[in-house]
């Protein structure tokens, strides 16, 4: 605290020292006293209202406090006074990244890297912005650029691994996530990412074992328990999933996602009142969550209360308007209310979002029967039957792969099956897994399918 005393003594002699107030603010900031830091920066601003660095520092305090609009406002004032200030461009990009405005983040981070090409934060954040905007190939180059300069950054290895996973380059994905874990083995989400990669390769036992390793570092981490529960849930082991979700909320009673996941598992176990209780707890913590509103609506549907169900499902559809399942259940609620016109509207929206939503196809077929539009009913029910038969055969092959995840012949059969039904993208993804497992012949087939996909996209 000696430095603070010196600055304050200097200010007793001359209050008009904005740089001194900035230095005082910096000391408080590095001592994690943001409120005192903000007061000092505000003093500096009063003394020199055109100083870009002051506004940048004020913006950083607001950013750390989660007040993104106020942070952005101050950063933009800083940029107005100094348009060559690379740090403030990075900070504006970071705020947009945190707020989900990925395209704006890309623009500002490009400015930052142009002004200060040697700063690795700008390139790393730019990679993250590209990844989050769905431009995964572009993100890889930026992460590699950072690692070429500093190869020991675990978070960059992890994010590069996630990007490779998004491109279905399994070998590279696993390698880089493992590199992250070697450099910092105590970070839970590294294990979760590696577990997801192995689970996607149908290696469920290994995926669960990786999460168990994460729990040896921190047994009370709810996110890891939820990840374990999700693996059990997708394999239909709802009781095991529920145990994991229970562990999550036992360690963190304020973890809304744990209660949401618990409510979903209880719903599938037909323990409806308990499901409602868990989902209401999740909504109490996070009222504007589409998932919790969706499933509590489904609980009310199962309890034959379509009016209440509709209210929750409608709210869910506003919160997540691109979720085909929400629109399907909203249509289902209208069917229970015998509102055939709205049922058709909502079910049609579900099918627009997911043309393979067989439940919605079946439901709208029944709605058209009620509306005496028999030709349309037959058409939709025929598509439903075709999809049902396809999924039955596909699921049989997937079950065999889960039992024998390293048998290459099964992957080849599944890829052929997908291509025969014109699902070329899915066939290519299966072959990528086969290539990772060592099937040399699959590589040639994969290249052929890639060519077909490129032709189709022109």
Regions found by a protein language model. Name each.
Residues 18-19, 52-53, 86-87, 120-121, ...:
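Helix-start (N-cap) detector for alpha-helical repeat units in TPR-like alpha-solenoids
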Residues 378-380, 386, 393-458:
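Terminal, low-structured helical/coil segments at or just beyond the last alpha-helical repeat
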Residues 13, 47, 81, 115, ...:
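Structural marker of alpha-solenoid helical repeat scaffolds
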Residues 1-9, 30-43, 53, 64-77, ...:
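Structural signature of tandem alpha-helical TPR/SEL1-like repeats
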Residues 23, 57, 91, 125, ...:
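Canonical tetratricopeptide repeat
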Residues 329-340, 346-370:
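Repeat-solenoid scaffold signature
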Residues 1-9, 23-26, 30, 60, ...:
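Alpha-helical segment of the N-proximal tetratricopeptide repeat
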């Amino acid at each position: 605290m000696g430095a603070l005393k010196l600055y304050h003594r200097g200010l007793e002699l001359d209050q008009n020292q904005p740089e001194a107030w900035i230095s005082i603010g910096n000391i408080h900031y590095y001592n994690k006293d943001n409120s005192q830091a903000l007061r000092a920066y505000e003093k500096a601003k009063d003394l020199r209202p055109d100083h870009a660095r002051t506004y940048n520092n004020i913006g950083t305090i607001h950013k750390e406090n989660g007040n993104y609009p106020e942070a952005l406002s101050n950063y933009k004032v800083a940029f107005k006074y100094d348009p060559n200030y690379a740090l403030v461009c990075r900070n504006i990009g970071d705020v947009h990244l945190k707020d989900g405005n990925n395209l704006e983040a890309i623009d500002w981070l490009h400015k930052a890297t142009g002004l200060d090409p040697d700063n690795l934060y700008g390139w790393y954040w730019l990679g993250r912005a590209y990844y989050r905007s769905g431009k995964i190939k572009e993100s890889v180059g930026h992460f590699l650029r950072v690692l070429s300069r500093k190869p020991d950054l675990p978070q960059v290895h992890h994010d590069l691994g996630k990007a490779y996973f998004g491109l279905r380059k399994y070998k590279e994905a696993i390698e880089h996530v493992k590199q992250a874990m070697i450099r910092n083995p105590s970070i839970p989400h590294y294990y979760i990412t590696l577990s997801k990669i192995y689970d996607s390769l149908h290696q469920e036992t290994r995926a669960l074992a990786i999460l168990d390793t994460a729990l040896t570092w921190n047994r009370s981490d709810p996110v890891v328990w939820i990840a374990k529960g999700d693996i059990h849930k997708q394999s239909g082991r709802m009781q095991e999933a529920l145990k994991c979700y229970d562990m999550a909320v036992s360690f963190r009673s304020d973890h809304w996602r744990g209660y949401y996941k618990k409510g979903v598992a209880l719903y599938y176990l037909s323990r409806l009142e308990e499901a409602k209780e868990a989902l209401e707890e999740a909504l109490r913590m996070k009222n504007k969550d589409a998932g919790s509103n969706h499933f509590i609506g489904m609980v009310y549907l199962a309890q034959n209360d379509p009016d209440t169900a509709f209210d929750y499902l409608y709210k869910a559809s506003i919160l997540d308007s691109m979720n085909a399942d929400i629109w399907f259940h909203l249509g289902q609620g209208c069917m229970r209310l015998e509102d055939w016109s709205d049922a058709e509207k909502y079910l049609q929206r579900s099918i627009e979002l997911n043309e393979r939503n067989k439940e919605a196809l079946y439901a709208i077929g029944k709605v058209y029967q009620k509306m005496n539009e028999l030709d349309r009913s037959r058409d939709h029910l025929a598509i439903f039957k075709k999809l049902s038969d396809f999924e039955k055969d596909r699921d049989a092959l997937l079950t065999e792969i889960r039992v024998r995840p390293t048998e290459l012949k099964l992957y080849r059969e599944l890829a052929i099956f997908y291509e025969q039904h014109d699902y070329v993208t899915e066939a290519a993804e299966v072959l990528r897994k086969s290539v990772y497992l060592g099937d040399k012949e699959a590589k040639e087939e994969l290249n052929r399918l890639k060519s077909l996909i490129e032709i189709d996209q022109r």
